[in-house]
Amino acid sequence: MDAQTWPVGFRCLLLLALVGSARSEGVQTCEEVRKLFQWRLLGAVRGLPDSPRAGPDLQVCISKKPTCCTRKMEERYQIAARQDMQQFLQTSSSTLKFLISRNAAAFQETLETLIKQAENYTSILFCSTYRNMALEAAASVQEFFTDVGLYLFGADVNPEEFVNRFFDSLFPLVYNHLINPGVTDSSLEYSECIRMARRDVSPFGNIPQRVMGQMGRSLLPSRTFLQALNLGIEVINTTDYLHFSKECSRALLKMQYCPHCQGLALTKPCMGYCLNVMRGCLAHMAELNPHWHAYIRSLEELSDAMHGTYDIGHVLLNFHLLVNDAVLQAHLNGQKLLEQVNRICGRPVRTPTQSPRCSFDQSKEKHGMKTTTRNSEETLANRRKEFINSLRLYRSFYGGLADQLCANELAAADGLPCWNGEDIVKSYTQRVVGNGIKAQSGNPEVKVKGIDPVINQIIDKLKHVVQLLQGRSPKPDKWELLQLGSGGGMVEQVSGDCDDEDGCGGSGSGEVKRTLKITDWMPDDMNFSDVKQIHQTDTGSTLDTTGAGCAVATESMTFTLISVVMLLPGIW
């Protein structure tokens, strides 16, 4: 035997000798037990036995041999055993909880950035192309994107209503500045009449319906995805602090602290013994496993479907193009709309007015024309893919939790002497049961009774969110429009195939990075050269300036409401 292996072998022989001595003669002093009791802050050592004695009043740590425990110590040990169990659960779930919570925060932050960027693009459209109506349109643009954010983050707002509200407010501006320009009626009553007439005269054609369809395909899945992540955090928080039954508490005490009473504080339980105790204590939690598995699978399916026309970045960052198309369509049908408005609202009392124009800040030209996330290395779709790849590792988390705790934390290694609940033995000889409530009928260590109502509530929530996730996942071969209230429009069906250009690839590392590349198809400089542009001259006539581009940028609108909206899990 060489110099390196001798100490290891010697220690093993010494341990076996000590174990044999403890089994045959019992512990001679309680000094080490007293020290550990004090070190764990379980109570004062005053009154604790100095040497082993009979323990007739013990309820769980019963032994024929003299003991270092009193009834008071046993009660303190039982509290410590429950606390240890909760600590083990929290430690085991901490990585999973961190994965979900950090990614939920990153997704929310990225969506907020998308919304602000889309709002900025729409503001730039008005300031560069429809300057005379830009300041009047600012409030409607801000309100629209605030509503988008509120809806995404769980507020009770109706997408159909805020889309209609935006186009209702846009029509009076288009009418006064493009259809009947130059001199306008300044009365609120006449503008309100024009606003109310929008849905009757349809100045923007089917574009409002197209916007509703796009919002339905992109906003609702993203909203549901965020809410589902929030529920995942709630499930983990709940299971981290489960109440353990009396039978479980007694079994934990017997497994972890009864060896202390015999002076065997460093002895670990046998693997089979540990599995029986932990599988019994966590039997109800194991019932979550199939529902947790379905939850992760449904998240994956929804994530895979959220690309192409279902990609929220594509929809939001192209919203300004649909607004421009809507204004152009109304301008092209100006004469017809003029007659319809005159018929509905009458002819206005015409008074000369001067519309306020945008105030430009040349120093901020580049600031507004570039996306703030252009230097990022990944798309939002890739982030979802990486997150799901990491989350897949936890599909059987609740089904294998008892085994994980015994293997990683609690049980003795194979081949070492271990505690079987009564004494130090070479191996555990009782039957080892499986996971789940049904398997516990033959558990020799823990009696499992009834059904845990808290676990049942979690199961019901998981079932419900799985239904929501599956309901928001378009079919891969034939996607259907998600209904929004009573509205919505006809949309084309598109393929659900996912390729690299869709941004569906991912490394699967799950590492959280604070900056996200929102799109890989937006130019570095937002360019309006392809946008049909109509500028109003000082004389009231209109001038086509297609290709002129946007010379300056405006500050993005403030978005304070979204920052304070929390995810709302209470929809279930």
UniProtKB/Swiss-Prot annotation:
Keyword Ligase among UniProt keywords: no
Major subcellular location class: membrane
Distribution of this protein across tissues and organs: In adult, primarily expressed in the brain. Also detected in fetal brain, lung and liver.
Superkingdom as given in the UniProt entry: Eukaryota
Membrane topology category: Lipid-anchor; GPI-anchor
Glycan attachment sites: 120, 237, 441, 486, 495, 507, 509, 527
Annotated signal peptide: 1-24
Localization (cell): Cell membrane
Annotated GO biological process: cell migration; positive regulation of canonical Wnt signaling pathway; regulation of protein localization to membrane
Keyword vocabulary terms for this entry: Cell membrane, Glycoprotein, GPI-anchor, Heparan sulfate, Lipoprotein, Membrane, Proteoglycan, Secreted, Signal
GO CC, alphabetical: cell surface; extracellular region; Golgi lumen; lysosomal lumen; membrane; plasma membrane; side of membrane
Region (Disordered): 355-375
Protein family according to the UniProt entry: Belongs to the glypican family.
Cited function: Cell surface proteoglycan that bears heparan sulfate.
Name this protein carries in UniProt: Glypican-5
Organism in which the protein naturally occurs: Homo sapiens (Human)
This protein's encoding gene: GPC5
